[in-house]
Amino acid sequence: SSWSNADEGYILLSNNSSNIESWSKISLPMGPYGFDHNKYNHAASGDINNDGFIDVVVSITRDLPYYEGAYIQVLINDGQGALKDMTETNFFNQPRSQTHHGEGNIYLRDMNLDGSIDIIHSTRDYSSGYHGAHIAINDGNGNFNSITNDDLPNKPNSGYNNYDFLMKSLPINIDNEACIDFISVTDAGWENSTDETSNYLFTVLNTACNF
């Protein structure tokens, strides 16, 4: 079948052949900001509800206001390769979805070592009042709750922008102690090159796997 302007995205479902044109094309659910106003930044796949099928998590922002809002869409595999948008029931509370810069990467890692995949959305912002290091914990059934600001430290240096909340988060086991930690960064300003700080990386260690 042909591509349609009525759809915003597709999954190409392999039939185990190398002929991509013969693969099935499955329409994706529409994003939260209305048709043709969603900007899809990044996606990651994994079995988030432990049913044996691969699901997809998508980071989405909007076109107007430009890149305002950082939304995470949870798409659950029905077992036949079709993805159902379960965000309203599985990840309803998302305060960053309206007033947080929308650019960022999605990572799926088991942050608290409970056997279920959690979501890490690596973003940045200067005014929302939320960390750009966004970690959402899975309850084991594919339902997510974001950890609070108080569960994470502020930046050791607020930087040129005088903003204390964390920018970015790359999940990695830094200290080889089983728990997943992450690397963050100060975000240099660019408005005045004579006053801006230099970017530098710093680590946040998850010492008890208790996110």
Residue ranges and their predicted role:
Residues 35-41, 59-63, 67-70, 122:
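Beta-propeller domains
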Residues 39-48, 102-113, 165-174:
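Beta-propeller blade termini
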Residues 170, 179-211:
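Blade-level signature of beta-propeller repeat domains, shared across WD40, Kelch, NHL, RCC1
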Residues 1-2, 50-60, 113-122, 176-185:
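Acidic/hydrophobic-patterned starts of short beta strands in beta-sheet-rich repeat architectures
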Residues 3-6, 62-66, 124-128, 188-192:
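Short glycine/acidic-enriched loop and turn motifs that connect beta-strands
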Residues 12-38, 76-101, 137-164, 205-211:
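Blade-edge motifs of beta-propeller repeat domains
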Residues 8-12, 71-74, 132-136, 200-203:
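A short loop-to-beta-strand structural motif that recurs across blades of beta-propeller domains
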Residues 47-49, 53, 78-79, 110-112, ...:
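Calcium-coordinating acidic loop motifs
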